[in-house]
Amino acid sequence: MSKTVDLLGQQAEYYLNHTCKTIDKKLIHVPGPDVIDKIWVDSDRNVRTLNSLQALYGHGRLANTGYVSILPVDQDIEHTAGASFAPNPIYFDPENIVKLAIEGGCNAVASTFGILGAVARKYAHKIPFVVKLNHNELLTYPNSYDQVMFGTCLLYTSDAADDRISV
């Protein structure tokens, strides 16, 4: 903590002992081990979604605190792999991305369907996966910022466990 105080300098007291007086504490959902029961259970989310959320909140170094740390890696698709991974070429390999998330104690790893699909058999039971479906198509000129869905997966909507959308 002393390093933090040193970094904050003269403003350490202000930042570390700040009490908000503009928003009533009762209006805030404070993270905690019961976040699924307090926030999500009464929502319209289906049972599988609630189960997946509990797996996510219950995994990694922040397990059951109500906080999450997710390693998001989709740079190789959206922003070219050369620009993103050239300094660390081992991350061209999807397995190393997942290993990094596990070693870092992340609650989950988020990436594209292809990246996660390539390593799912080996790692899906070791860390929750979050599939990112929102990708811009930046391969053409001029750039198109339309969201392009690609890959093949099955999504369950929050309306009912039986509703399925094939992407």
What are these regions (language model features)?
Residues 75-92, 132-147:
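Active-site mouth loops of central-metabolism enzymes
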Residues 92-99, 145-155:
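Short, acidic/polar
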Residues 120-137:
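Alpha-helix-loop-beta-strand connector modules within alpha/beta enzyme cores
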